[in-house]
A protein has these predicted regions:
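Positively charged, low-complexity/disordered segments
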Residues: 1-9
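Juxtamembrane C-terminal module of membrane proteins
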Residues: 137-140
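Short strand-edge motifs at loop-to-beta-strand transitions and within beta-strands
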Residues: 142-144
Length: 184
């Protein structure tokens, strides 16, 4: 499954765009493009595949942080950004930033773009919603690369938050269901 990033207005989004059987509503016996023919799986059976459930991770990520102050901001990425699959996509609020990295390529992130002298950072898996605290950092340009390697399903979202804020707890291994969080 390919998870790709895009900007929608001032919103970063991650979407499942690689399951041909679902995208094309493949049915057995009907031809389709991109090599999908329905012999392996009909679109209704593909709804049970892992990629179909990934949108809940996007929902939890987006609703964890203040919505109306969020803006796209590629200046968060210091130095040279990659192209195509190596291009990182950034959005931020006043005290947090999110950087989607499809390929796992090393990136330089300017942590001074948000408030606070110290920042807490996590990796968030777009594939399974796992959250991994990676430490506290000074407010400066800092190198990040997830240890899962380069390409082949290693897309991650870097989450960085002003250490004075508590949007995300260091001990969390997943983001809570956002709807339940806001209904408390």
């Amino acid at each position: 499954y390919e998870i790709s990033a895009c900007l929608v207005g001032s919103e970063m989004c991650i979407r499942d765009s690689g399951h041909n059987d679902i995208m094309q509503f493949i049915r057995p016996g009907y031809g389709a493009s991109f090599g999908a023919d329905g012999r392996k799986k009909a679109w209704w059976d593909a709804l049970e595949d892992p990629g179909f459930n990934q949108m809940k991770y996007l929902k939890n990520l987006m609703l964890t942080f203040p919505f109306f102050e969020r803006v796209p901001d590629q200046s968060v990425i210091a130095g040279t950004n990659g192209e195509r699959y190596d291009r990182a996509i950034a959005t931020r609020g006043n005290d947090y930033l999110l950087v989607y990295n499809y390929s796992g390529r090393p990136m330089q992130i300017d942590l001074s773009k948000i408030s606070g002298a110290k920042k807490n950072a996590w990796w968030y898996s777009a594939k399974d919603g796992k959250l991994e605290y990676i430490g506290e950092f000074d407010s400066k340009v800092t190198s990040f690369q997830h240890d899962s390697g380069y390409l082949s399903g290693n897309d991650q979202v870097l989450i960085v938050v002003d250490s004075a804020k508590d949007y995300v707890q260091k001990a969390w291994t997943a983001l809570p269901d956002a709807i339940q969080k806001w209904n408390k």
